[in-house]
Amino acid sequence: MNVFMPIRVFLYSYVIINSLLSSFFHQYRPLFIKNGAAFGVSNSEKICVTLIVNELI
């Protein structure tokens, strides 16, 4: 389990940073979000959450 700890920390930080970026862009650049940035961020978050759940199981 100790081998997977840096990977888990990286995935958690990646999801947190992506959510912060999406909220920032949603607040200040709604046109940028409408052009597909929110879709990409949500997709990467889904992938990271799936990886975290699979690693925990």
UniProtKB/Swiss-Prot annotation:
Cellular-component GO terms for this entry: membrane
Localization, UniProt: Membrane
Main location: membrane
Transmembrane segments: 4-26
Entry keywords, A to Z: Membrane, Transmembrane, Transmembrane helix
Source species, domain of life: Eukaryota
Name assigned to this protein: Uncharacterized protein YLR342W-A
